[in-house]
């Protein structure tokens, strides 16, 4: 089943840089909250939130949290109803998770332009390592 959707909006929930420099080593990337999924049933919207920290020797030098909102078409939403749930397939979550992660990467690039933190590029994350199951949303009538 092909799921029709649109990337409806992006919310920068948190962004901060702290003392430190990306030129220091070792530079490490850690996902503080990883990828979290949520939904707005009435709006037929899936929300993917990416949280990440950049650390140097256990000191956070940058933190970011971005929520991406994906509006599902009414026909696709209805087509995913199964046994009292709207079941969002994990393969679709991989797709929109990847879009969300790439969006976060782009925001970091834009927010750090002209600083030494701009040399940091978030690594590729394989969505099957952070999303393990379909999303099951109880039907609300």
Description of each model-found segment:
Residues 1-99, 109-141:
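N-terminal intrinsically disordered, cationic/polar leader segments
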